Design a protein with these regions (language model features):
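Function-determining surface determinants
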Residues: 1-248
Length: 248
């Protein structure tokens, strides 16, 4: 975020800022009941910063991961138009008084001490409740994933990502080996659902790209043929993950 505020950010800085903001949103949303000191406004402020960062990282992923696969399957070299995200606008946003106040408020909360003396005793129960809910949201549709609407399928991808973030936040309270084993079983779900989602992002981008380059029709055909395969792979990954033993 400092690099963005200084006006020297590149694509990786944008990506890391988006990941950081995503993690914060997950924590504030799923752990909101853990403290009376959490300001409900923070989550929306963070969400707005996230939206302003745009979709440049998604486009980078299509260029570096999806396009090379399509070229390997016989497509001519494809060049996706670059959408310019004005760094100057982002610099102004991240240097604004509102953003600075948000960061300072989050830091003050992070370094504050909880007044409730029974907080530690209640923490494990709160963790179990939060993780149980997220875990259920990830696995509840495992047996009929392929029957869901695409928007519902992508919600499961987001929940899987949030589950990982929340586990990483509280991982120090549990045996490291147990946490790592569980996350290892979650990883295939994230990988397949992530690639499945990328295909739909690519489909939208390629539809627009056909207006200036007809070679993207080949890419569109490849994407449409690949989507059912990744859908089935995602369903299988979810079914396997459903059998994983929870550690909390």
């Amino acid at each position: 975020m400092a690099a963005i505020a200084d006006g020297v950010a590149d694509a990786e800085h944008i990506h890391q800022a988006r990941v950081s903001l995503r993690r914060l949103r997950s924590a504030l949303h799923h752990f909101a009941t853990w403290s009376d000191e959490l300001n409900p406004v923070w989550e929306e402020q963070i969400a707005e910063l996230f939206r302003k960062l745009g979709d440049t990282r998604d486009e980078d992923a299509i260029r570096t991961e999806i396009l090379p696969m399509i070229v390997q399957h016989g497509s001519p070299e494809l060049l996706l138009p670059i959408s310019e995200q004005p760094l100057k606008d982002l610099t102004t946003l991240f240097k604004s008084a509102e953003t600075v106040k948000l960061v300072l408020a989050l830091l003050a909360f992070a370094y504050s001490e909880e007044d409730n003396q029974n907080a530690k005793g209640k923490l494990k129960k709160q963790i179990e409740k939060s993780l149980d809910k997220l875990h259920h949201q990830v696995i509840s549709h495992a047996d009929h994933f392929t029957e869901l609407e695409v928007t519902e399928q992508h919600k499961i991808r987001k929940k899987a990502k949030q589950l990982r973030y929340c586990i990483e936040f509280i991982s120090s309270l549990y045996p490291r080996k147990n946490v790592q084993q569980f996350l290892k079983k979650l990883q295939p779900v994230q990988n397949t659902l992530g690639l499945y989602n990328d295909l739909f992002i690519a489909e939208d981008l390629f539809n627009k790209a056909t207006e200036h380059d007809p070679h993207f029709w080949f890419a569109l055909g490849w994407i449409k043929a690949k989507q059912p395969y990744l859908q089935n792979q995602s369903a299988e990954a979810l079914q396997k993950f459903k059998q994983a033993k929870i550690f909390w």
